[in-house]
UniProtKB/Swiss-Prot annotation:
Residues 188-202 have a biased composition (Low complexity). Gene3D superfamilies: Ankyrin repeat-containing domain, Arf GTPase activating protein, Pleckstrin-homology domain (PH domain)/Phosphotyrosine-binding domain (PTB). Residues 259-420 form the PH domain. Residues 441-561 form the Arf-GAP domain. One of its GO terms (molecular function) is zinc ion binding. The gene is AGAP7P. This is Putative Arf-GAP with GTPase, ANK repeat and PH domain-containing protein 7. Residues 182-216, 231-255 are annotated as: Disordered. Keywords: ANK repeat, GTPase activation, Metal-binding, Repeat, Zinc, Zinc-finger. InterPro entries: Ankyrin_rpt, Ankyrin_rpt-contain_sf, Arf-GAP_GTPase_ANK_PH, ARFGAP/RecO, ArfGAP_dom, ArfGAP_dom_sf, PH-like_dom_sf, PH_domain. It comes from Homo sapiens.
Length: 663
């Protein structure tokens, strides 16, 4: 049925191959074959095992015939080891061969103990009809035999070696051609390399590792999995420690930042359409901000954070009413089934406000009004076990879920306390800001009391609340929208009540006013009808664009032989604000940056800062003067502002990028 290849291992002789014949060269004449009955189990081994000799021989008792000249079992499949008939033939032939060799050993008085000590491992490989005609069988056998001495050298010295049973090794190789030599021996010619398949045995496969060579195919090896450290955050860090109980390390992390009053892992529902729950590391600080991170590592590195401002938010628990003692001015949701979204979208509705000083013991519990759909909502409340929601004033909702009821209630109580503390601090800071802004309010009131500022500069609407900074005028809200469409080059719009007003801006507004501005911008109106409060927006826009964009009503320049730039220099030196505004309205950027003709190289900005006039300095900057310009001595306007001790001019110049020589 097939031939038998016997592999023997000698512990004292190195592995040798015959390069010319292409087969393993034996160093001794003995051939030792052992079956399952003859193995010497428990035989002691030497402490140091040397590389072994491996001999591969083809038995002569069973000669190899060509597959076409031999009788094959009808039910024989590709793998003979899986066929009962092939296994029976193999067992009969191999057992007969072993019995004959054993009888020969007894006749010649050959001791098996000698072989058990001399040879460390013996195994018989059966070559059936399917494996005998496949490629590169020689190299496959060599690769297997190379594994044996390497395995012996790597074994524990205290481990005893037992000769394994005869095993059926099936090789999944391509094709091999066997030729007959003149001396009766068999030689194998290989044509393609292959990888041996796993032997069909019940014993556990040993882990072999053969050094790769050019002529040896890669064997199938079992190697232990190694964890890669390519993506570890820090050198020497253990990624397993970061995954274990991050709550236990909460008190030892976050140095250099505000220590959270509460922190831990919570589940957060994503806002996408999938609505998946992901773990987040959530921190609550005393500044009224709830921050969540993707992991504890991100919190330690202070990256990938998202914050929720609790001052403008409220917390809701499904199936529970909020505690009135811990919430201040919290809107109460209606009993409609729509829930949070409708309440936040409207932004209106009933709300109950309580003083922060009222304690929970003085206020009775509020029972929710009976709802006709209460029975329908019971199953919905059961689904939301440990989750809570944070809803902002804009309607944005964050869903969180804790592991237990107690943990959820602790988070809810802590967040409610921070909401109340944020509202209280907001009230105290607002009162402080009111005290500090009294001077600003008085200054703004003085601007409104100026001549002509009681009406809109363009349509005469009463009590205007909007201003144009570079024009120095007040206007109504409708005209302010038209001024915004002109662009900041022509009009810089700002609200009297909503925006901040620094000192230099208040001085500009209090120095010009509507009457002075209209005397310049409407100096040549030629009797045209000015729009009124009842005029349409189109009429107001037509008037405003003709007045400021086309400059149709602008007063004419004074008759003089000086250029506009020189006139501007003189008006700045004389601090003539009305003439300077007229010249700026008529002039271009080049004319505004004209220097004095006396050789000192000063611009109008240098002269304004030398005088310490912040109004002229600010107007010149808005109309395009170069703040980086230097005079003949290399001085900037900031140098003259420092000489004049004008802090307002210094602030304006630094704000617009004037180089500071003192830094």
């Amino acid at each position: 049925m097939g031939n038998i290849l016997t592999c023997r291992v000698h512990p004292s002789v190195s592995l040798e191959f015959d390069q010319q014949q292409g087969s393993v060269c034996p160093s001794e004449s003995e051939i030792y074959e052992a079956g399952a009955e003859d193995r010497m189990a428990g035989a002691p081994m030497a402490a140091a095992v040397q590389p072994a000799e491996v001999t591969v021989e083809v038995g002569e008792d069973l000669h190899m015939h060509h597959v076409r000249d031999r009788e094959m079992p009808e039910a024989l499949e590709f793998n003979p080891s899986a066929n009962p008939e092939a296994s029976t033939i193999f067992q009969r032939n191999s057992q007969t061969d072993v019995v004959e060799i054993r009888r020969s050993n007894c006749t010649n008085h050959v001791s098996t103990v000698h072989f058990s000590q001399q040879y460390s491992l013996c195994s018989t490989i059966f070559l059936d009809d399917s494996t005998a005609i496949q490629h590169y069988l020689t190299m496959t056998i060599i690769s297997v035999t190379l594994e044996i001495p390497h395995h012996i050298t790597q074994r524990d010295a205290d481990r005893s070696l037992s000769i394994p049973d005869e095993q059926l090794h099936s090789f999944a190789v391509s094709t091999v051609h066997i030729t007959k030599n003149r001396n009766g021996g068999g030689s194998l010619n290989n044509y393609s390399s292959s990888i041996p398949s796993t032997p069909s045995t019940s014993q556990e496969d040993p882990q072999f590792s053969v050094p790769p060579t050019a002529n040896t195919p890669t064997p199938v090896c079992k190697r232990s999995m190694r964890w890669s450290n390519l993506f570890t955050s820090e050198k020497g860090s253990d990624p397993d420690k970061e995954r274990k109980a991050p709550e236990n390390h909460a008190d030892t992390i976050g140095s250099g930042r505000a220590i959270p009053i509460k922190q831990g892992m919570l589940l957060k529902r994503s806002g996408k359409w999938l609505k998946t729950w992901k773990k987040k590391y959530v921190t609550l600080c005393s500044n009224g901000v709830l921050t969540y991170y993707s992991s504890l590592g991100d919190y330690m590195k202070y990256i990938h954070k998202k914050e929720i401002d609790l001052q403008t938010s409220t917390i809701k628990v499904p199936g529970k009413w909020p505690s009135l003692a811990t919430l201040a001015c919290t809107p109460i949701s209606s009993s409609k089934s729509d829930g949070l979204s409708k309440d936040m979208d409207t932004g209106l509705g009933d709300s109950i406000c309580f003083s922060p000083s009222i304690s929970s013991t003085t206020i009775p519990k509020l029972n929710p009004p009976p709802s006709p759909h209460a029975n329908k909502k019971k199953h919905l409340k059961k689904k939301s076990t440990n989750n809570f929601m944070i809803v902002s004033a804009t309607g944005q909702t964050w869903h969180f879920e804790a592991t237990t009821y107690e943990e959820r209630d602790a988070w809810v109580q802590a967040i409610q306390s921070q909401i109340l503390a944020s509202l209280q601090s907001c009230e105290s800071s607002k009162s402080k800001s009111q005290l500090t802004s009294q001077s600003e309010a008085m200054a703004l009131q003085s601007i409104q009391n100026m001549r002509g500022n009681a009406h809109c500069v363009d349509c005469e609407t009463q009590n205007p609340k909007w201003a144009s900074l570079n024009l120095g005028v007040l206007m109504c809200i409708e005209c302010s929208g038209i001024h915004r469409s002109l662009g900041t080059r022509l009009s810089r719009v700002r609200s009297l009540e909503l925006d901040d007003w620094p000192v230099e801006l208040r001085k500009v507004m209090s120095s010009i006013g509507n009457d002075l501005a209209n005397s310049i911008w409407e100096g040549s109106s030629q009797g045209r009808t000015k729009p009124t409060e009842k005029s349409t927006r189109e009429e107001k826009e037509r008037w405003i664009r003709s007045k400021y964009e086309e400059k149709l009503f602008l007063a004419p320049l004074p008759c003089t032989e000086l250029s506009l730039g020189q006139q501007l220099l003189r008006a700045t030196a004389d601090e003539d604000l009305q003439t300077a505004i007229l010249l700026l309205a008529h002039g271009s950027r080049e004319e505004v940056n004209e220097t004095c003709g006396e050789g000192d190289g000063c611009t109008a900005l240098h002269l304004a800062c030398r005088k310490g006039n912040v109004v002229l300095a600010q107007l010149l900057i808005w109309y395009g003067v170069d703040v980086m310009a230097r005079d003949a001595h290399g001085n900037t306007a900031l140098t003259y502002a420092r000489q004049a001790s004008s802090q307002e001019c210094i602030n304006v110049l630094l704000q617009y990028g004037c180089p500071d020589e003192c830094v």
